[in-house]
Design a protein with these regions (language model features):
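Active-site and channel-lining beta-strand-loop segments
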Residues: 18-20, 191, 203-204
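Buried hydrophobic positions in well-ordered alpha/beta secondary-structure cores of metabolic enzymes
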Residues: 24, 140, 202-204
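Amphipathic alpha-helical packing elements
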Residues: 3-37, 44
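Feature captures the catalytic cores and cofactor-binding loops of soluble hydro-lyases/lyases
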Residues: 34-200
Length: 205
């Protein structure tokens, strides 16, 4: 039971035969990402559909920045569940053994690189489900350059985030509360976003 385990990531993405990041995530080339930035959602969806991947689209999001150019990048995933004391203690012990510090959301953001997109399942939690605030959004922007986040949950500090350039965060709700009462059970593991399944390294559009 490890977070961001290279062997697990390689096993779950075994169809990928190209380059990988040190953590095992598939590294789709920069040139492919750039081509996708100039395609429509219908064109991108059709590519997945032709591969019989029928559960790769989820709409019904709000976004922090309304831009004509889509946010495209490689997924770094996080899966959260409602807090339960015994599980929380086990996950915190595991994180400590791997040298992780701070809050759950900080662990994942610390590992982001250029063109990453932070994809997080917070079970559609709004109050106390505010995964990203102004400070964390700034760090995401600095690390990903033009990436962002997809949050099946909520965010806070919306006005502050909207002042940050070259980032877009897709989210379900907004709330002023801090994040609490959640436990991270998967970091770069399979992640459900509504009706879609996301694996680490997937291209996010």
């Amino acid at each position: 039971m490890q977070f961001n385990n290279r062997d697990d990531i390689i096993q779950m993405t075994s169809y990928w035969t190209g380059e990988r990041f040190p953590d095992g995530r598939p590294r789709v080339s920069d040139s492919v990402l750039e081509r996708l930035r100039n395609m429509s959602i219908e064109e991108v969806w059709r590519l997945a559909w032709m591969k019989l991947n029928n559960y790769q689209f989820q709409g019904e999001f709000k976004c922090t920045h309304n831009t004509q150019k889509p946010t495209v990048g490689r997924a770094v995933t996080a899966t959260f569940v409602p807090i339960r004391e015994d599980l929380e203690l086990a996950m915190m012990r595991q994180a400590k053994s791997q040298g992780m510090k701070g809050m759950y959301n900080q662990w994942v953001v610390d590992g982001l690189v250029e063109d990453d997109v932070f994809v997080a399942d917070l079970f559609d939690k709004t109050e106390y489900g505010t995964l990203v605030g102004g400070n964390l959004a700034t760090v995401i922007r600095q690390k990903t350059k033009r990436g962002g986040a997809v949050v099946w949950g909520s965010i806070r500090d919306l006005q502050q985030i909207r002042e940050i350039e070259d980032i877009n965060i897709f989210y379900r709700g907004f709330h002023p509360s801090p994040i609490r009462d959640i436990t991270l059970v998967g970091y770069n593991a399979p992640c459900r976003i509504g009706h879609a399944t996301c694996l680490p390294g997937d291209v996010v559009y």
